[in-house]
Amino acid sequence: VLIGSSLGGFYATQLVAKYGVPAVLINPAMRPWQLFHGLFGGELPYVVNAQWTLDQTQLDQLEQMAVPFVQDADKILVLLQQDDEVLDYREAQRYYSNAAHQSMIMTEANGNHAMDNFADKIPMALQFLSDCIK
């Protein structure tokens, strides 16, 4: 079972594609290599913090990891908020709804990248995951 937010949602998607495990994704990043490049103004390497410096090699690795579609997309619950200040929620809507077995997608008006009122969504997420592993 996986739960991933933003970049963690991108990584979780790769693991669902590879292992078929269920996941809950919170405002997942769709193309993080482009996102990071845009956020940091193309200035690489970028020192994120004392332990992490982002460079072009890492961005290239992220791009190589991307999967064109997820076969087991029905094992994914996607939680999106339209006022995400970092990501365009419509990219995730398109990606996760284009699979043969569509993901369950919940899109809310307003909100933000950190997912407003996430605690209210925990019971639904747990029920979804429980149904997936039965």
Question: What is each PLM-predicted segment?
Answer:
Residues L15-Y19:
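Aromatic pocket-lining residues of Rossmann-like dinucleotide-binding sites
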Residues V1-I3, L25:
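Short, conserved beta-strand segments within well-ordered enzyme catalytic domains
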Residues P22-I133:
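The alpha/beta-hydrolase serine catalytic core
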